[in-house]
Each structure stands twice: as C-alpha cells, then as structure tokens.
Amino acid sequence: MATSHGVLRSLDNAKTQSYHYLAIVIAGMGFFTDAYDLFCITAVTKLIGRLYYSDPTNHSPGILPTNVNNAITGVALCGTLAGQLFFGWLGDKLGRKKVYGITLTTMVGFALLSGLSFGSTPKTVVTSLCFFRFWLGFGIGGDYPLSAVIMSEYANQKTRGSFIAAVFAMQGVGILVAGGVAMFVSKLFLLYFPAPDFETDAVLSTQPEGDFVWRIVLMFGAVPAALTYYWRMKMPETARYTALVEGDHKKAVEDMAKVLDRNILSEESNTRIAIRPLESHSYGLFSSEFLNRHGLHLLGTTSTWFLLDIAFYSLQLTQKDIYPTSGLVYKASKMNAIEEVFQLSRAMFAVALIATVPGYWCTVFLIEKIGRFRIQLIGFLVMSVCMWFLGHNYRSFRGEESACKNGSKYSFCNGNPVMFAILFGLTLFFANFGPNSTTFIVPAELFPARLRSTCHGISAAAGKSGAIVGAFGVQSYIGNSHDKSKGTKQAIMALAVVNLLGFFFTFLVPETQGRSLEEISGEEKDFQGNNADEEISGERNGTRNASVDKSPETSMV
C-alpha cells in the first residue's frame, strides 16, 4: 500500500488524465453560474427601472433610484462575502466534498427564485429580488474557496496553475453567456412584441412582456450548474485533505486510485516516509507561528484581491451607464424597453468576446510559462495606464451632447468611441490576463492544507469587500455627482491609482510556480523534521519506525 507521501507525489507527478478535465468542468460550471448570476443583472437593471419606476410626469424613461440600483447590483456581493468566509472555514472543518454540494444547491435554488421575485409594488418586487440575490450570493461565495482548493489539490505540479485558471476562466464564459442570453431573449421578445421608442410613445415603449425578459435571464444561470450536480456529488474527497487533515492515509490512496491511473500510484508508492501532519504542524490561524510563516502572504493575497475588485467590479457593474455615454449604445429615449436590453447585452457580449474571455484563456495557456507573479504585475500596471488615459481623456472620447443634431440616436457626438472601446477592452483583457485570475489562483497554493480553504475564503472575501466598494461607493459617487461627466472622469482616474497600489502590494506575494503545495506551504519541511525525530527516537530504543522499516508493499499508516 502506498504511503500518504507517495499519494501526494503521485498527484504531483501524474500525467494529465481525463479526470483532471472532468474536475475542471465540474468545478468550472459552478463558476459559470457564479459569473452569470453576478453579471447578468447589469443587462436588465435598466429594464426593471422602466417597468417599475416610470414617472408619467418625467420626460425620460424610468430609471432605478441610485440606492435601489446599488442594492440590486450590490446585495449579491454582500452575500458572496459572507459565503466565502463561512464556506471557506467549513471546507477546512468538514472537508471539501461535504460542503461542495451545499453551495451548488444554494446557487441553483436561489437563481431560480430570483426570477420568481414577487410583489404588486416596486418596493416588494425589489425587496424580494434583493433577498433572493443575497442568498444566491451566499452560495456563490462558497464556490470560490472550494473550487479553487479542490482543483489545486487534485492537479499535478506541472499544470496546477493552468488547471485552476481553467476553472476560473469559466467566469469569463459566464459573463459572455450572460450577455448572449440577454441578447437572445430580448431579440426574441422584440420580434413578437414590437413597440415604438420612448420619444414616439412614452407609454407603449415599455412593453409589459418585458417583465418576463428579466426573469428568464436571471433564471437561466441555474441550468448548466444543475446539470453537473450528479458529478459533483460523485467526486471523492481530495487526497491532500484526507491524508493531511483527517490523517486517513489508506482512504486517501483508495480515493485517488478511483480517479487516477493505478500504475502511477504503484510507481510512486516505494517511498518509505510516513507523515503525521497533525502532530508536526498544529499551529492555528490566529497563532504567532501562522503570523510568522504566512502573515505577509495573507496580507498580500487579501490586499491585492481587494484593490483589484474595486476596479474590476466598478467597470463590470457600470457598463450599463458607460456604454450609452461612449456611443456604443443608443440613448434611452430612442429605444423601447426591451430594445434597450438588447443594445446593452449586445455591447456586453461583444466586449466579453473580444477582451474578457481571451484574457482568461491567455492566463490558462501562459501561466506556467510566465508565472503568477509576472502576470499579476503586468496586469495591474497595464490596467493602471489604460484607466488613467481613459479617465484623463474621458470627455474627448465621449464627445459632447451639444454636438448631436436633432433626432440623433446617441447621447453624445463627435467623440472617439473606437479609442474608448480599445482602452476599455485592454483594461478588461489585462484584468483577466492578470490579477483577476492570479488573485484567485495563488491563495489556493500558498497555505497549509488544513487552513487552505479558510485562507482562500478570507482572501476572496477581501476581494468582495472591494467589489462592494465599487458597487456602492463608486456608483454612488458617479450617480450623485452634479456633473456626471466630471464624476465619471474622477472615478476612473481614482481606479487607476487603485490599480497602481495593487502593483506594489503584489511584491508581498511569492511566486508559486513549479513547486508542490507542501513545499510552498512549508508542510514538507514539517514532515521531514517529524520523521527524522521519530527515526532518532526509534534508534535510541533499539527499534526503527515500522513505517520506515517495512517494505513498500506492506507499509501502511
């Protein structure tokens, strides 16, 4: 029987097998749902505003009040933060597998309920929607640490970064599909329920059938994740958790034998090292030992993720406001309610296809060649430069309202929407081929097995607190500015400074490329020291540790 050290070596040295790809799909579908549910709301908030907050005395389409808009877009992020902390801790206490199914069930259930938000008044509809989206976010939050840690503990040493990045890249696919589904559903409804634009007829421009559009869009995200529920439940516990945390080395071997090539396990089983992790490194999260070993690491992962998400979510959640002013979408009064969803989602889809998704997959293919550290540094730096130019030249890129002729479909004219789109696209590309991916990957590698999920959850929660700053703080600042153009310019330039801070905080995070998880976390030294002490003790007593003396074929811990 292979020892637990042999199992860990087997995992690190295993060739890429079909099960690795299956694990990517299973974990990745959770992230597909995560991204879809968090970002599809951007495509439909303006529709909800037209449906529930229209004012007949106002000569412009209905919009969500700033506080309501912030609540709808930000409440899921609050739930996500809570879920990351809770399920991250629970994943270390109960095991990755036991908790994994709970997060998926929560996501699927509350994604469906979000589309069934009920009430006869705007207040009750929005309240029920926010309630369901908070708990949707709670489930999404649990998927962050669990998916990252499961993939890192299953993966081999050579391609671990690419595998974790591939799981996270499904976030990009989720953003793309969110735009695609909203575009398809709105186009379908436009064909069957045409209506004049707002300027032609303010009342008829808001089709009552639009109430089905936003509900269908919100509910669709549950479908792909639900299809993977069976396989998620069939996944065995990771060998690293079973061996290093539970101390059940025999079961770790049996579990991995089910999913990995048995020949690989037998080839690696001739090690004679038996590890006793619970005795050799029992320091806790709040101990001075953890602070000495990993305090700066945790500061680095939390600070960089926090700073990144301020900028990333500010851009993603304000797309609905940025696109019309940049000339990528018609002004609201020149569209009916469902057409506005189509225009916004088409812009979202195009930007995701050209900039967002390629950034994720560049990380997948290049992370093991360039390394996490360099990708994160380059990403933060390019984001900072692009956003500085975008903010500094915002008015010239946007154009002027006075330059538009009567009957123009655009809010601003004589700007430079092409240059705006290029800089905006580059920012998103280098966010994803940069810190948005690496801040997810590195916390799943840096910390010891029994604290790995907790520390990833803490890092991710720090990121979501940054996202909340973006969703509530940045959006409120722009929304409450007397001169929205000036407010947007100042906000974008401030985000450039935030990215620059992320660049410098990256130096707190070490490179993890090309090393085993046990070497990175320091567990390997603990194992070696523990076994050396046991061997010396055995020699003093005239005997040697049984797990060292026995032949590999009969050694069992």
Swiss-Prot record:
Biased composition (Polar residues): 543-557
Domain of life: Eukaryota
Region of interest (Disordered), ranges: 519-557
A molecular function GO annotation: symporter activity
Pfam families on file: Sugar_tr
Topology relative to the membrane: Multi-pass membrane protein
Induction data: Accumulates in roots during colonization by arbuscular mycorrhizal (AM) fungi (e.g. Glomus versiforme).
Transmembrane region(s): 21-41, 71-91, 99-119, 131-151, 163-183, 211-231, 295-315, 347-367, 370-390, 415-435, 458-478, 491-511
Subcellular locations according to the entry: Cell membrane
Cellular component per GO, a single term: periarbuscular membrane
Gene3D superfamilies: MFS general substrate transporter like domains
Catalysed reactions, as listed in the record: phosphate(in) + H(+)(in) = phosphate(out) + H(+)(out)
SUPFAM superfamilies, A to Z: MFS general substrate transporter
Any single GO BP term: cellular response to nitrogen levels
Glycosylation sites: 406
Record-stated family: Belongs to the major facilitator superfamily. Phosphate:H(+) symporter (TC 2.A.1.9) family.
Role summary: Low-affinity transporter for external inorganic phosphate (Pi) that may be involved in the acquisition of phosphate released by arbuscular mycorrhizal (AM) fungi (e.g. Glomus versiforme and G.intraradices) during AM symbiosis; not required for mycorrhizal arbuscule development.
Protein's name according to its UniProt entry: Low affinity inorganic phosphate transporter 8
